[in-house]
């Protein structure tokens, strides 16, 4: 597997996880867990941006 396709696969998985977390975030809005989910989503956004910059 080439480096580029490996990075693309990691981006795809990160975006899928982000989408899952965003749907869970909607369910915990207004609860103490909301901040926890938002932090995870923010970290995934950073990871996705970093990976895309490597392409």
Please identify what each model-predicted range represents.
Residues 10-55:
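Short, charge-rich amphipathic interface segments used for partner binding and complex assembly
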Residues 4-7:
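Repeat-based scaffolding regions
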């Amino acid at each position: 597997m080439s480096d580029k396709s490996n990075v693309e696969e990691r981006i795809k998985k990160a975006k899928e996880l982000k989408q899952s977390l965003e749907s869970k975030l909607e369910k915990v809005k207004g609860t103490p867990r909301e901040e926890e989910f938002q932090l995870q989503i923010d970290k995934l956004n950073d990871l996705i941006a970093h990976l895309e910059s490597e392409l």
